[in-house]
Protein backbone atom coordinates (compact mmCIF):
# COMPACT_ATOMS: atom_id res chain seq x y z
CA UNK A 1 0.00 0.00 0.00
CA UNK A 2 1.39 3.37 -1.02
CA UNK A 3 1.79 5.88 1.78
CA UNK A 4 0.24 9.30 1.22
CA UNK A 5 1.74 12.40 2.80
CA UNK A 6 -1.77 13.71 3.48
CA UNK A 7 -2.34 11.13 6.23
CA UNK A 8 0.43 11.52 8.83
CA UNK A 9 -1.61 10.20 11.75
CA UNK A 10 0.19 6.88 12.13
CA UNK A 11 3.58 8.55 12.10
CA UNK A 12 2.29 10.82 14.85
CA UNK A 13 1.37 7.74 16.91
CA UNK A 14 4.92 6.40 16.65
CA UNK A 15 6.33 9.82 17.50
CA UNK A 16 4.08 9.99 20.56
CA UNK A 17 5.33 6.62 21.76
CA UNK A 18 8.92 7.81 21.44
CA UNK A 19 8.12 11.10 23.15
CA UNK A 20 6.51 9.27 26.08
CA UNK A 21 9.60 7.10 26.46
CA UNK A 22 11.93 10.08 26.36
CA UNK A 23 9.80 11.95 28.90
CA UNK A 24 10.24 8.96 31.22
CA UNK A 25 14.00 9.04 30.61
CA UNK A 26 14.13 12.72 31.56
CA UNK A 27 12.06 12.12 34.66
CA UNK A 28 14.36 9.34 35.85
CA UNK A 29 17.39 11.53 35.22
CA UNK A 30 15.86 14.49 37.00
CA UNK A 31 16.40 16.61 33.89
CA UNK A 32 20.15 16.55 34.48
CA UNK A 33 21.22 15.28 31.05
CA UNK A 34 19.94 15.09 27.49
CA UNK A 35 18.57 11.66 26.52
CA UNK A 36 20.97 9.67 24.34
CA UNK A 37 19.34 8.19 21.23
CA UNK A 38 20.96 5.73 18.83
CA UNK A 39 19.22 5.61 15.43
CA UNK A 40 20.42 2.59 13.45
CA UNK A 41 19.77 2.80 9.73
CA UNK A 42 18.47 6.31 10.33
CA UNK A 43 19.48 7.48 6.88
CA UNK A 44 18.65 11.09 6.16
CA UNK A 45 17.36 11.91 9.64
CA UNK A 46 13.60 11.41 9.41
CA UNK A 47 13.54 10.57 13.11
CA UNK A 48 16.89 11.92 14.26
CA UNK A 49 16.41 15.59 13.44
CA UNK A 50 13.02 15.95 15.22
CA UNK A 51 14.41 14.09 18.24
CA UNK A 52 17.43 16.38 18.34
CA UNK A 53 15.04 19.35 18.16
CA UNK A 54 13.41 17.94 21.30
CA UNK A 55 16.75 18.16 23.09
CA UNK A 56 18.14 14.66 22.56
CA UNK A 57 21.73 13.79 21.69
CA UNK A 58 21.31 11.57 18.62
CA UNK A 59 23.83 9.26 16.96
CA UNK A 60 22.79 8.03 13.52
CA UNK A 61 24.46 4.93 12.11
CA UNK A 62 23.93 4.30 8.41
CA UNK A 63 25.95 2.63 5.66
CA UNK A 64 25.04 5.29 3.07
CA UNK A 65 27.39 8.25 2.85
CA UNK A 66 24.84 10.12 0.73
CA UNK A 67 22.09 9.66 3.32
CA UNK A 68 24.38 10.89 6.08
CA UNK A 69 25.24 13.96 4.00
CA UNK A 70 21.52 14.74 3.79
CA UNK A 71 21.27 14.18 7.55
CA UNK A 72 24.02 16.70 8.25
CA UNK A 73 22.37 19.25 5.97
CA UNK A 74 18.96 18.78 7.57
CA UNK A 75 20.47 19.03 11.05
CA UNK A 76 22.21 22.30 10.13
CA UNK A 77 19.02 23.73 8.65
CA UNK A 78 17.11 22.79 11.82
CA UNK A 79 19.77 24.31 14.06
CA UNK A 80 20.58 21.01 15.79
CA UNK A 81 23.88 20.08 14.15
CA UNK A 82 25.58 20.12 17.54
CA UNK A 83 23.22 17.42 18.80
CA UNK A 84 23.44 15.03 15.83
CA UNK A 85 26.38 12.71 15.24
CA UNK A 86 26.60 10.85 11.91
CA UNK A 87 28.52 7.58 11.75
CA UNK A 88 28.98 5.58 8.56
CA UNK A 89 28.59 1.89 9.36
CA UNK A 90 26.07 -0.88 9.73
CA UNK A 91 24.46 -2.84 12.52
CA UNK A 92 27.50 -5.10 12.81
CA UNK A 93 29.56 -2.13 13.98
CA UNK A 94 27.33 -1.14 16.89
CA UNK A 95 29.59 -2.70 19.49
CA UNK A 96 32.39 -0.37 18.37
CA UNK A 97 30.14 2.69 18.17
CA UNK A 98 28.23 2.28 21.43
CA UNK A 99 28.84 4.88 24.11
CA UNK A 100 31.38 4.01 26.73
CA UNK A 101 28.99 5.19 29.43
CA UNK A 102 26.60 2.25 29.40
CA UNK A 103 24.58 2.49 26.21
CA UNK A 104 21.77 4.56 24.76
CA UNK A 105 18.59 5.65 26.54
CA UNK A 106 16.60 4.80 23.39
CA UNK A 107 17.61 2.71 20.37
CA UNK A 108 15.75 2.98 17.07
CA UNK A 109 15.67 0.28 14.40
CA UNK A 110 13.10 1.78 12.05
CA UNK A 111 13.00 0.33 8.54
CA UNK A 112 16.04 -1.79 9.37
CA UNK A 113 15.04 -5.44 9.75
CA UNK A 114 13.58 -5.56 6.22
CA UNK A 115 17.04 -5.04 4.74
CA UNK A 116 19.63 -6.75 6.95
CA UNK A 117 21.02 -10.15 6.01
CA UNK A 118 20.79 -11.49 9.57
CA UNK A 119 17.84 -10.10 11.57
CA UNK A 120 18.75 -12.16 14.63
CA UNK A 121 22.21 -10.62 14.79
CA UNK A 122 20.70 -7.19 14.14
CA UNK A 123 18.23 -7.47 17.01
CA UNK A 124 20.94 -8.68 19.36
CA UNK A 125 23.07 -5.70 18.38
CA UNK A 126 20.20 -3.28 18.97
CA UNK A 127 19.53 -4.81 22.38
CA UNK A 128 23.20 -4.69 23.29
CA UNK A 129 23.41 -1.01 22.38
CA UNK A 130 20.63 -0.07 24.81
CA UNK A 131 21.44 0.74 28.41
CA UNK A 132 19.93 -1.66 30.97
CA UNK A 133 16.29 -0.72 31.46
CA UNK A 134 16.18 1.29 28.25
CA UNK A 135 13.88 0.83 25.26
CA UNK A 136 14.36 -0.41 21.72
CA UNK A 137 11.87 0.81 19.11
CA UNK A 138 11.45 -1.29 15.96
CA UNK A 139 9.38 -0.41 12.91
CA UNK A 140 9.17 -3.15 10.27
CA UNK A 141 7.18 -3.76 7.07
CA UNK A 142 4.00 -5.79 7.67
CA UNK A 143 3.40 -8.94 5.65
CA UNK A 144 -0.40 -8.94 5.46
CA UNK A 145 -0.75 -5.33 4.32
CA UNK A 146 1.56 -6.07 1.41
CA UNK A 147 -0.62 -9.01 0.37
CA UNK A 148 -3.81 -6.94 0.49
CA UNK A 149 -2.19 -4.01 -1.26
CA UNK A 150 -1.22 -6.15 -4.23
CA UNK A 151 -4.66 -7.72 -4.46
CA UNK A 152 -6.29 -4.27 -4.52
CA UNK A 153 -3.83 -3.22 -7.25
CA UNK A 154 -4.69 -6.30 -9.32
CA UNK A 155 -1.26 -7.90 -8.86
CA UNK A 156 -2.72 -11.19 -7.75
CA UNK A 157 0.23 -13.40 -8.72
CA UNK A 158 2.56 -11.25 -6.62
CA UNK A 159 0.09 -11.41 -3.73
CA UNK A 160 0.01 -15.20 -3.92
CA UNK A 161 3.79 -15.47 -3.97
CA UNK A 162 4.11 -13.01 -1.09
CA UNK A 163 1.58 -14.92 0.99
CA UNK A 164 3.27 -18.27 0.37
CA UNK A 165 6.86 -17.13 0.76
CA UNK A 166 8.34 -17.74 4.25
CA UNK A 167 9.99 -14.31 4.17
CA UNK A 168 6.98 -12.47 2.78
CA UNK A 169 8.60 -11.56 -0.55
CA UNK A 170 6.86 -11.44 -3.91
CA UNK A 171 9.87 -12.46 -5.99
CA UNK A 172 13.53 -11.96 -6.84
CA UNK A 173 12.91 -8.32 -7.72
CA UNK A 174 11.41 -7.47 -4.33
CA UNK A 175 13.52 -4.68 -2.79
CA UNK A 176 12.86 -5.99 0.73
CA UNK A 177 14.56 -9.08 2.12
CA UNK A 178 11.57 -9.83 4.35
CA UNK A 179 8.26 -8.67 5.73
CA UNK A 180 6.98 -9.76 9.10
CA UNK A 181 3.80 -10.18 11.11
CA UNK A 182 3.32 -9.16 14.73
CA UNK A 183 4.07 -12.62 16.12
CA UNK A 184 7.33 -12.82 14.18
CA UNK A 185 8.51 -9.42 15.37
CA UNK A 186 7.62 -10.19 18.98
CA UNK A 187 9.39 -13.56 18.88
CA UNK A 188 12.48 -12.04 17.31
CA UNK A 189 12.79 -9.37 19.98
CA UNK A 190 11.97 -11.59 22.94
CA UNK A 191 13.57 -14.89 22.01
CA UNK A 192 16.60 -13.67 20.09
CA UNK A 193 17.10 -10.20 21.52
CA UNK A 194 16.35 -11.01 25.15
CA UNK A 195 14.04 -8.00 25.31
CA UNK A 196 10.70 -7.56 27.05
CA UNK A 197 8.01 -6.40 24.61
CA UNK A 198 5.82 -3.65 26.08
CA UNK A 199 3.92 -2.23 23.10
CA UNK A 200 2.82 -3.63 19.74
CA UNK A 201 1.01 -1.23 17.43
CA UNK A 202 0.01 -1.06 13.81
CA UNK A 203 1.56 1.81 11.86
CA UNK A 204 -0.71 2.96 9.02
CA UNK A 205 -3.58 0.51 9.41
CA UNK A 206 -6.47 2.25 7.67
CA UNK A 207 -5.16 5.67 6.63
CA UNK A 208 -3.83 4.35 3.32
CA UNK A 209 -7.28 2.96 2.44
CA UNK A 210 -8.96 6.37 2.68
CA UNK A 211 -9.21 7.74 -0.90
CA UNK A 212 -8.57 11.31 0.27
CA UNK A 213 -8.36 13.33 3.45
CA UNK A 214 -11.86 13.41 5.01
CA UNK A 215 -13.75 16.67 4.57
CA UNK A 216 -15.03 18.87 7.34
CA UNK A 217 -13.48 20.38 10.46
CA UNK A 218 -13.45 17.04 12.25
CA UNK A 219 -12.38 14.87 9.30
CA UNK A 220 -8.66 14.75 10.04
CA UNK A 221 -9.30 14.30 13.76
CA UNK A 222 -11.73 11.47 13.08
CA UNK A 223 -9.18 9.74 10.87
CA UNK A 224 -6.49 10.18 13.52
CA UNK A 225 -8.74 8.71 16.21
CA UNK A 226 -9.70 5.80 13.96
CA UNK A 227 -6.08 5.08 13.10
CA UNK A 228 -5.06 5.24 16.77
CA UNK A 229 -7.75 2.76 17.77
CA UNK A 230 -7.16 0.41 14.83
CA UNK A 231 -3.43 0.35 15.55
CA UNK A 232 -4.15 -1.17 18.96
CA UNK A 233 -6.95 -3.55 17.94
CA UNK A 234 -6.24 -7.03 16.56
CA UNK A 235 -6.81 -8.21 13.90
CA UNK A 236 -6.80 -4.73 12.32
CA UNK A 237 -3.47 -4.00 14.01
CA UNK A 238 -1.94 -6.99 12.26
CA UNK A 239 -2.96 -5.64 8.84
CA UNK A 240 -0.87 -2.48 9.21
CA UNK A 241 1.63 -1.39 6.58
CA UNK A 242 4.27 -1.46 9.29
CA UNK A 243 4.44 -2.95 12.76
CA UNK A 244 5.75 -0.79 15.59
CA UNK A 245 7.11 -2.54 18.66
CA UNK A 246 8.64 -1.00 21.78
CA UNK A 247 10.65 -3.47 23.85
CA UNK A 248 12.89 -3.03 26.87
CA UNK A 249 16.26 -4.38 27.82
CA UNK A 250 15.98 -5.97 31.27
CA UNK A 251 17.75 -4.23 34.10
CA UNK A 252 17.39 -1.32 36.49
CA UNK A 253 16.32 1.95 34.92
Language model regions located:
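Conserved class I S-adenosyl-L-methionine
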Residues: 33-41, 135-164
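Conserved alpha-helix/loop element of class I SAM-dependent methyltransferases that forms part
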Residues: 8-33
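Short alpha-helix
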Residues: 174-193, 200
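Class I SAM-dependent methyltransferase SAM/SAH-binding core
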Residues: 46, 50-93
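A conserved beta-strand element that flanks and buttresses the S-adenosyl-L-methionine
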Residues: 108
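A short glycine-rich, Lys/Arg-flanked "PGG" loop and its adjoining helix->strand segment in the class I
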Residues: 120-135
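Conserved Class I S-adenosyl-L-methionine
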Residues: 199-253
